[in-house]
Swiss-Prot record:
Compositional bias of kind Low complexity: 43-61
Annotated region described as Disordered, given as residue ranges: 1-110, 151-176
One BP annotation, GO: ribosome biogenesis
Presence of keyword Kinase: no
Name of the protein described by the UniProt record: Der GTPase-activating protein YihI
Biological role stated in the UniProt entry: A GTPase-activating protein (GAP) that modifies Der/EngA GTPase function. May play a role in ribosome biogenesis.
Biological source species: Cronobacter sakazakii (strain ATCC BAA-894)
Subunit relationships: Interacts with Der.
Compositionally biased tracts (Acidic residues): 154-166
Length: 176
């Protein structure tokens, strides 16, 4: 009752048995494989030619060799080199602070509110932090430098006061 069906057994129609190859056919296939195997790999001289051979096969235009430089003639004489190359002026870096004359800088330092406040604290006997003390010292040193440049000194002011007192004494004494 049960009959074997061909569709259940195989996935398609029944195949005929494959016939065995003869020794000549096997030898011919082996020779073909050997010939194909010989031609595998890179072509001779491919290291030297390199990218140009692969570039042509891909259809791109030929690439320029990066090792070859400019064709522009280079002058070998000293005088020629100076004439052809214009001298470039490098711009000087601008300082953050505008350049002030020594008198203007001295006036600015004397009117500095932070310096005045720190000097008042020092006169009152307070001790300043190391940063504040270093800043005050640097400002006072700069004031001294500027006064020396301008030819001013603290002694000049004291001398002027003494001279004024002497002049007043002369006027009071008798007028010569």
């Amino acid at each position: 009752m049960k009959q074997p069906s061909s569709s259940v057994r195989g996935k398609g129609p029944a195949k005929a048995k494959a016939r065995r190859k003869t020794r000549e056919e096997l030898n011919q296939e082996a020779r073909d494989r050997k010939r194909d195997k010989k031609h595998r790999g890179h072509a001779p001289g491919s290291r030297a030619t390199g990218a140009s051979a692969s570039g042509k096969s891909s259809g791109q235009s030929t690439q320029k060799d990066p090792r070859i430089g400019s064709k522009k003639p280079i002058p070998l004489g000293v005088s020629d080199a100076q004439e052809t190359r214009p001298q470039k002026h490098q711009p000087q870096p601008k300082s953050e602070k505008p350049m002030l004359s020594p008198q203007e800088e001295l006036d600015m330092l004397e009117n500095d509110e932070r310096l005045d406040a720190l000097l008042e604290r020092l006169e009152e006997g307070e001790t300043l932090s190391a940063d504040d003390q270093a800043w005050v010292d640097s400002r006072l040193d700069r004031i001294d430098e500027l006064m020396q440049q301008l030819g001013l000194s603290y002694d000049d002011e004291e001398d002027e006061e003494e001279e004024q007192q002497e002049d007043m004494m002369r006027l009071l004494k008798g007028g010569n």
